[in-house]
Amino acid sequence: MQYKKSLVASALVTTSLAAYAPKDPWSTLTPSATYKGGITDYSSTFGIAVEPIATTASSKAKRAAAISQIGDGQIQATTKTTAAAVSQIGDGQIQATTKTKAAAVSQIGDGQIQATTKTTSAKTTAAAVSQIGDGQIQATTKTKAAAVSQIGDGQIQATTKTTAAAVSQIGDGQIQATTKTTAAAVSQIGDGQIQATTNTTVAPVSQITDGQIQATTLTSATIIPSPAPAPITNGTDPVTAETCKSSGTLEMNLKGGILTDGKGRIGSIVANRQFQFDGPPPQAGAIYAAGWSITPEGNLAIGDQDTFYQCLSGNFYNLYDEHIGTQCNAVHLQAIDLVNC
């Protein structure tokens, strides 16, 4: 697979020209193109699972991994997963693990979203991603089914080498997931970041006040019953995967092309090209804050693009809409219905 070889520095320079200033109408921060056949309104709450593009032709199961969110809104996911769900932490960031077989991405409190890498099959026993307080989303690596939680800053983190890991959310919105899990669920912390543990089989993740989402390691997984699919407001429902919803799981809503998390923060592509949740309004310098859709294939898209990149940051990955470095892998963010189990 061919990747774009752009430098982070050059990306920051070129994108800063159209960056969002706090007084600007952020709802107009949309890409110039739209995804053909994409759904811009979805009537049900849904999560996302990270599916590496190299393995999207593998299994198309009915149950996928949800991503959690931590408090800061960041979202992170694991790598080499089969079906890992990502959580969200408080800052809104989303992060996922690495070397998972199906890793879902979580969200932490600051709204950032991160997903795992090298995942194989999601949609059957997939992992949901959690959110931490800052909105970032992060996932672990080498998990087989790691769930990601959410911490207060919104970051989301998830594990790696997971088969079905759910990600939680922490307070900052970041999303992170664990690594080497088989089916770990991630919780949410206050900043929105989402983080998950490593070496877990199925570990549920909790949420801390900053929104970050973190999950334990060396846990085991359970089978999820199959409820009715979620309704949509236009077109044919493209979402064919589902996973159990738990505390801290990254929960998203799509209305009029605007993506929000469970705390009402805005899903955006920020100045460094990272996907996270902030605000409202989105953080200063944001590039896109609208123009989201679900593709006919069931993937999350921004504009006419449904390819995202999970880039290694320590023991987790952050999610970006562009290839920003050598340790980045192309992924799809698969939409999955969240059900009460």
UniProtKB/Swiss-Prot annotation:
<feature type="repeat" description="PIR1/2/3 8">
    <location>
        <begin position="202"/>
        <end position="220"/>
    </location>
</feature>
<dbReference type="InterPro" id="IPR051153">
    <property type="entry name" value="Yeast_CWMannoprotein_PIR"/>
</dbReference>
<feature type="repeat" description="PIR1/2/3 1">
    <location>
        <begin position="64"/>
        <end position="82"/>
    </location>
</feature>
<keyword id="KW-0961">Cell wall biogenesis/degradation</keyword>
<dbReference type="InterPro" id="IPR054508">
    <property type="entry name" value="PIR1-like_C"/>
</dbReference>
<feature type="site" description="Covalent attachment to cell wall glycan">
    <location>
        <position position="174"/>
    </location>
</feature>
<feature type="repeat" description="PIR1/2/3 4">
    <location>
        <begin position="126"/>
        <end position="144"/>
    </location>
</feature>
<feature type="site" description="Covalent attachment to cell wall glycan">
    <location>
        <position position="136"/>
    </location>
</feature>
<dbReference type="GO" id="GO:0031505">
    <property type="term" value="P:fungal-type cell wall organization"/>
</dbReference>
<feature type="site" description="Covalent attachment to cell wall glycan">
    <location>
        <position position="93"/>
    </location>
</feature>
<feature type="site" description="Covalent attachment to cell wall glycan">
    <location>
        <position position="74"/>
    </location>
</feature>
<keyword id="KW-0325">Glycoprotein</keyword>
<keyword id="KW-0677">Repeat</keyword>
<feature type="propeptide">
    <location>
        <begin position="19"/>
        <end position="63"/>
    </location>
</feature>
<dbReference type="InterPro" id="IPR000420">
    <property type="entry name" value="Yeast_PIR_rpt"/>
</dbReference>
<feature type="signal peptide">
    <location>
        <begin position="1"/>
        <end position="18"/>
    </location>
</feature>
<keyword id="KW-0732">Signal</keyword>
<comment type="similarity">
    <text>Belongs to the PIR protein family.</text>
</comment>
<feature type="site" description="Covalent attachment to cell wall glycan">
    <location>
        <position position="193"/>
    </location>
</feature>
<dbReference type="GO" id="GO:0009277">
    <property type="term" value="C:fungal-type cell wall"/>
</dbReference>
<feature type="repeat" description="PIR1/2/3 3">
    <location>
        <begin position="102"/>
        <end position="120"/>
    </location>
</feature>
<feature type="repeat" description="PIR1/2/3 6">
    <location>
        <begin position="164"/>
        <end position="182"/>
    </location>
</feature>
<feature type="site" description="Covalent attachment to cell wall glycan">
    <location>
        <position position="155"/>
    </location>
</feature>
<feature type="repeat" description="PIR1/2/3 2">
    <location>
        <begin position="83"/>
        <end position="101"/>
    </location>
</feature>
<protein>
    <recommendedName>
        <fullName>Cell wall mannoprotein PIR1</fullName>
    </recommendedName>
</protein>
<feature type="site" description="Cleavage; by KEX2">
    <location>
        <begin position="63"/>
        <end position="64"/>
    </location>
</feature>
<comment type="function">
    <text>Component of the outer cell wall layer. Required for stability of the cell wall and for optimal growth. Required for resistance against several antifungal and cell wall-perturbing agents and for tolerance to heat shock.</text>
</comment>
<feature type="repeat" description="PIR1/2/3 5">
    <location>
        <begin position="145"/>
        <end position="163"/>
    </location>
</feature>
<keyword id="KW-0134">Cell wall</keyword>
<dbReference type="Pfam" id="PF00399">
    <property type="entry name" value="PIR"/>
</dbReference>
<keyword id="KW-0964">Secreted</keyword>
<dbReference type="Pfam" id="PF22799">
    <property type="entry name" value="PIR1-like_C"/>
</dbReference>
<dbReference type="GO" id="GO:0005199">
    <property type="term" value="F:structural constituent of cell wall"/>
</dbReference>
<dbReference type="GO" id="GO:0005576">
    <property type="term" value="C:extracellular region"/>
</dbReference>
<feature type="site" description="Covalent attachment to cell wall glycan">
    <location>
        <position position="112"/>
    </location>
</feature>
<feature type="site" description="Covalent attachment to cell wall glycan">
    <location>
        <position position="212"/>
    </location>
</feature>
<keyword id="KW-0165">Cleavage on pair of basic residues</keyword>
<feature type="repeat" description="PIR1/2/3 7">
    <location>
        <begin position="183"/>
        <end position="201"/>
    </location>
</feature>
